[in-house]
């Protein structure tokens, strides 16, 4: 088990690496990021299989897609973006110099244990930050494997030793201590309390292409057994098209439950009023069998009807599994209100989806959803894929502004191409000590005691877990 003092040494090593990396120029940083993305892409299949084997959650083939999207996919998305070189605004006579945050603590989830490591590490390196990965204990091995794969690639490409590290054995108290430690500059927490679960509604109105909507919704809900926060949670359908929609979804692998079957499923999934963690990321057939339901072996999604969207209706809550709640409404206005209610139950500030050919309806729907992203006529786990990466490069840098006199008569020199950063020469910087168990310098003191997590914060015991 990683101890508090040892974790403190990881942070010290990360700070050392961050200081060295902060002086790298844009060309060198780009080469390092490319090498890391390529390494992640090359191991996408192996690590996807490892993730499903270790956690029992999700579908390996779908995790391969995610791993590739979070490696070279992120690289392609930000291709041409420069978060290293100074920005020169000659019209406003302002030069902005980017400064990295420093050390990023990446708290990664068991539901997406590899792709989250990929995206956080790549975005951190893109902005010249160091990363310490704290895996969910349920996915310790595959997350650590992913982190070490990227760390090796980064150092081989010229990054400082220790730029990416991983906690060997994590625990809640250890992570809380790391989050509170002053040597941690940014906490990238995914899949933990405070990170914001998604409770995504999808509304299908009478104008929608029913066949296309059915296929997209089932495919999206079934994707990776719905462990992503962007997967649809509750289907809101207009009564006039509900029959056709259900028939079409059945052709794509959905099983529509009757009222009694939905009751039994609800009782199994929410026996004590909370989601049964055993269902997270499991196959629809696995869930059905344990709920006492008979379905065909090719069932991909269970659709569970209920009457009203309200907090007391557990099927209107986040389910993290291929179980889709469904309610019907008589018209567009009621559909929008029902979808909004779903969001407010557990997914405010996340995403929503609508299938419609009515521009007015789409606009009204988007305006009334308390979310930053609305997907239209697409599976939400695809249409809002970027929303799964809550961390953005802009959140990992700050800008120092150099401002000249705004008087047009006062000239500003030509700053084009000038940068304070360097192309490193010679061997890759190595950490002064090979072992993390050796401190390179004494910790700063406060009232005679070391500052940091070598002494546990209040309420957290400083012993092995």
Regions found by a protein language model. Give the residues of each.
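N-terminal Rossmann-like NAD(P)+-binding subdomain of aldehyde/semialdehyde dehydrogenases
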Residues: 1-95, 123, 251, 442-459, ...
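Short beta-strand/turn micro-motifs at beta-sheet edges
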Residues: 5-6, 92-94, 120-121, 222-223, ...
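Short, flexible turn/loop "capping" segments at secondary-structure junctions
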Residues: 10-12, 194-196, 224-229, 313-320, ...
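Structural signal for hydrophobic packing residues in well-ordered secondary-structure cores
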Residues: 15-18, 22-25, 33-44, 48-51, ...
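Conserved C-terminal structural/oligomerization subdomain of aldehyde/semialdehyde dehydrogenase
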Residues: 22, 293-452, 456-465
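Rossmann-like NAD(P) dinucleotide-binding subdomain of oxidoreductase/dehydrogenase enzymes
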Residues: 86-212
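Short hydrophobic/charged patches on amphipathic alpha-helices used for structural packing
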Residues: 175-176, 214, 336, 363
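ALDH superfamily catalytic-core signature
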Residues: 192-310
């Amino acid at each position: 088990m990683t101890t508090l003092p040892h974790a403190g040494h990881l942070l010290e090593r990360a700070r050392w690496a961050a200081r060295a990396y902060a002086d790298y120029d844009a060309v060198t940083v780009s080469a390092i990021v490319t090498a890391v993305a390529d390494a992640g892409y090359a191991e996408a299949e192996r690590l996807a299989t490892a993730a499903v084997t270790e956690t029992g959650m999700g579908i390996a083939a779908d995790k391969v897609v995610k791993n590739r999207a979070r490696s070279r996919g992120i690289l392609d998305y930000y291709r041409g973006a420069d978060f290293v070189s100074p920005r020169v605004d000659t019209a406003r006579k302002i030069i902005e110099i980017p400064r990295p945050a420093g050390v990023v603590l990446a708290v990664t989830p068991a539901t997406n244990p590899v792709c989250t490591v990929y995206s956080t590490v790549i975005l951190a390196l893109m902005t010249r930050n160091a990363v310490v990965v704290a895996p969910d204990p349920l996915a310790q091995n595959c997350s650590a494997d992913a982190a070490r794969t990227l760390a090796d690639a980064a150092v081989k490409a010229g990054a400082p030793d220790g730029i990416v590290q991983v906690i060997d054995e994590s625990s809640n108290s250890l992570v809380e201590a790391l989050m509170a430690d002053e040597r941690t500059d940014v906490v990238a927490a995914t899949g933990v309390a405070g990170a914001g679960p998604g409770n995504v509604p999808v509304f299908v109105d009478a104008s929608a292409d029913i066949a296309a909507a059915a296929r997209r919704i089932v495919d999206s809900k079934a994707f990776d057994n719905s462990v992503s926060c962007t997967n649809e949670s509750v289907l809101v359908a207009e009564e006039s098209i509900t029959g056709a929609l259900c028939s079409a979804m059945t052709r794509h692998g959905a099983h529509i439950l009757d009222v009694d079957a939905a009751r039994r499923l609800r009782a199994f999934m929410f026996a004590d009023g909370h989601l049964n963690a055993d269902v997270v990321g499991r196959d629809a057939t696995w869930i059905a069998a344990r709920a006492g339901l008979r379905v065909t072996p090719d069932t991909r999604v269970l659709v569970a009807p209920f009457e009203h969207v309200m907090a007391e209706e557990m099927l209107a809550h986040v389910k993290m599994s291929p179980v889709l709640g469904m309610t019907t409404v008589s018209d567009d206005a009621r559909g929008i209100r029902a979808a909004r209610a779903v969001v407010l139950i557990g997914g405010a500030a996340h995403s929503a989806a609508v299938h419609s050919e009515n521009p007015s309806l789409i606009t009204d729907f988007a305006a009334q959803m308390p979310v930053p992203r609305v997907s239209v006529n697409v599976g939400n786990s695809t249409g809002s894929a970027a929303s799964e990466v809550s961390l953005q490069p802009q959140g990992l840098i700050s800008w120092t502004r150099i401002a000249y006199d705004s008087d047009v008569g006062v000239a500003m020199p030509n700053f084009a191409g000038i940068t304070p950063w360097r192309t490193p020469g010679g061997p890759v910087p190595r950490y002064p000590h090979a072992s993390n168990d050796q401190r390179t310098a004494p910790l700063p003191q406060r009232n005679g005691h070391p500052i940091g997590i070598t002494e546990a914060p209040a309420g957290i015991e400083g012993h092995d877990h």
